[in-house]
Design a protein with these regions (language model features):
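Short, acidic/small-residue loops that bind anionic groups at enzyme active sites
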Residues: 46, 86, 103-126, 139-141
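Acidic/glycine-enriched connector segments
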Residues: 25-85
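Glycine-rich beta-alpha loop segments
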Residues: 1-41
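Active-site-adjacent beta-strand anchor residues
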Residues: 21, 86, 114, 148-149
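Glycine-rich, charge-decorated loop segments at or immediately adjacent to ligand/cofactor-binding or catalytic sites
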Residues: 26-33, 120-130
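A charged, well-structured terminal subsegment
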Residues: 78, 82, 133-169
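Active-site/ligand-binding-proximal alpha/beta "capping" segment
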Residues: 71-106, 113, 164-169
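Short, surface-exposed connector motifs at secondary-structure boundaries
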Residues: 10-17, 81-83, 109-111
């Protein structure tokens, strides 16, 4: 996917550190490869099951080993300043809702940035709006939990914002 290569190259050139699941497959492996080739530091957060199944990437500069997926999500959220959701499946949704749920009860004030490539997240975003209108989600109208980037340029502009994260968590 062109958008992943482009994002990886930008992150590398900006000398960012990427904290990710550390698997040797999927869009994050594509980003990690492009980012590392351009100077980024990679930290893979790897649950035992990935190691057991031989799915650990060789790209990370550092590996953090976890017992399970719950621990993995906790470490990624704790160690990250910014959390970007690329198009993905069940695992991506699990991570997104983990971040937003933890924010709703005050564990942190970090937002998910939905990288809404080709409108991938439109249906989910509409569902979240419907839940907010039904008063099942509070704070959504103030963008407390997420931001949306519909293009690479929008994503970069969001990532460049100086006060995007609350590091007092």
């Amino acid at each position: 996917m062109e958008t992943t290569r482009q994002l990886g190259e930008w992150l590398g050139k900006e000398k960012k550190t990427i904290i990710y699941g550390g698997a040797n497959l999927g869009l994050m492996e594509d980003i990690a490869s492009a980012a590392k080739a351009n100077g980024a530091t990679l930290i893979g957060v790897v649950p035992k099951i990935l190691e057991k199944n031989g799915k650990v990437s060789t790209l990370p500069d550092k590996l953090i080993h976890t017992v399970n997926l719950s621990d993995r999500k906790d470490v990624i959220v704790e160690e990250s300043d910014i959390l970007v959701a690329l198009p993905g499946g069940i695992g991506t949704l699990d991570e997104v809702f983990h971040v937003m749920a933890a924010s709703t009860i005050g564990y942190h004030h970090k937002k998910v940035i939905f990288y809404n490539v080709n409108g991938f997240y439109d249906t989910l975003l509409k569902a979240l709006q419907q839940m907010a209108q039904a008063q099942f989600i509070r704070g959504l109208e103030k963008n407390e939990y997420y931001l949306v980037a519909n293009s690479f340029n929008e994503l970069i502009n969001i990532l460049k914002k100086p006060n995007l994260t609350d590091n007092n968590d």
